[in-house]
Amino acid sequence: MTETSEAVEIAVGTPAAKHSESFVFERSIQTVGRRKEAVVRVRLVLGTGKFDLNGRSLEDYFPNKVHQQLIKAPLVTVERTRNFDIFALLHGGGPSGQAGALRLGIARALILASPEDRPALKKAGFLTRDPRSTERKKYGLKKARKAPQYSKR
């Protein structure tokens, strides 16, 4: 028995596995998520729900519980929190941007793993790339839109 088939049997044996035939894939699924200045490369592998973010655990990398919930949301939506291990390389941006980028990358990877989950993820808004980014500062102004105080005389 190969290592892949053993992993598939473990994943199928878990109660959260609804569609066992869609979990069969030879190698890991790789996707990219972006938000603000953050870029995250996600690798989804059959496993037990472990996160490896730049070599650290989810709790170490994102101590904020809000960010942790944001990241786990796509997995919770499709009820697959314990079926996959997630390895991610995060760079650029801050914690909020990286968390949003990781969420998008995970959602995209889940669709490649099981396409029947697409409607649920799309309805929840996990597949939409947030286009908002920082507006540049203009000369003559203090910030992007904040002008210096106007004095008539």
UniProtKB/Swiss-Prot annotation:
Signal peptide: none annotated. InterPro entries: Ribosomal_Su5_D2-typ_SF (IPR020568), Ribosomal_uS9 (IPR000754), Ribosomal_uS9_bac/plastid (IPR023035), Ribosomal_uS9_CS (IPR020574), Ribsml_uS5_D2-typ_fold_subgr (IPR014721). Residues 122-153 are annotated as: Disordered. Keywords: Ribonucleoprotein, Ribosomal protein. One of its GO terms (biological process) is translation. The keyword Ribosomal protein applies. GO terms for molecular function: RNA binding; structural constituent of ribosome. Belongs to the universal ribosomal protein uS9 family. This is Small ribosomal subunit protein uS9. It comes from Mycobacterium leprae (strain TN). The gene is rpsI.
